[in-house]
Amino acid sequence: MEGVDVKAPRPGCGGDDGGAAAASLSARREEEEEGAVVGGEDEQVERFYALLANIRALRGMYSRYNGEEGAAGGDGDGASGRKRARRAEPPWRPAFRMEDFEFEEAAAGAGDDDAACSGRTTKKQRSGGGGHGAAVEKRRTEKEAAAAAAEDDDDEQEGGEVVEGKEEHRPGRRVEAHGPTDQ
């Protein structure tokens, strides 16, 4: 028994160093558990790649069954083959006319007859004026009233007098009154 150390304690027999033996056993168990975890991860990775291989095989079988192998380009992807076979739509190129870029005032002033004949109405014609609704309508009635007063008082009409409006005071905006004023 030359090569055997007689003084070395045997595991499980109890010896002088019982705590060291227990520590080595717990370390060995931890290594086995880590190995099992790593083995479980390896098994999951292998199952994942097997699943991918099965999916590729099924796609290949499907494309061969439907006759899409040539259109797929050999990679077994029938969907991309259909996309390549589809014709591209031409780009959208709208046709513009100069009428599309004219201002409302120019279109209403110059093309009233054209708009009436073609059945198209401009925004100005639809709103009944300049597009400001009630304010435009109010100005129109004031002008009509002034014109009616001018017709009644033709004999007494004096030179045009400049009068400022009471409700809408805008600098530089003046209204010419027809007829005499009592002030």
UniProtKB/Swiss-Prot annotation:
For whether the record's keyword set contains ATP-binding, the answer is: no
A single Pfam family it belongs to is NPR1_interact
Q: Which UniProt keywords apply?
A: Nucleus, Plant defense
Domain of life per record: Eukaryota
Query: Can you cite a GO biological process for this protein?
Result: regulation of systemic acquired resistance
Please state where this protein is localized.
Nucleus
Q: Does the keyword Nucleus apply?
A: yes
- Identify the stretch(es) annotated as Disordered: 1-40, 66-183
Q: Where is the composition biased (Gly residues)?
A: 70-79
Q: What is its main location?
A: nucleus
- InterPro entries, per the entry: NPR1/NH1-interacting (IPR031425)
Q: What does it do?
A: Binds to and represses NPR1/NH1-mediated transcriptional activation of LG2 in vitro.
Q: Which PANTHER family match?
A: NRR REPRESSOR HOMOLOG 2, PROTEIN NEGATIVE REGULATOR OF RESISTANCE
Q: Which family does it belong to?
A: Belongs to the NPR1-interactor family.
Q: State the protein's name.
A: NRR repressor homolog 1
Organism, by scientific name, is Oryza sativa subsp. japonica
Chain's gene name: RH1
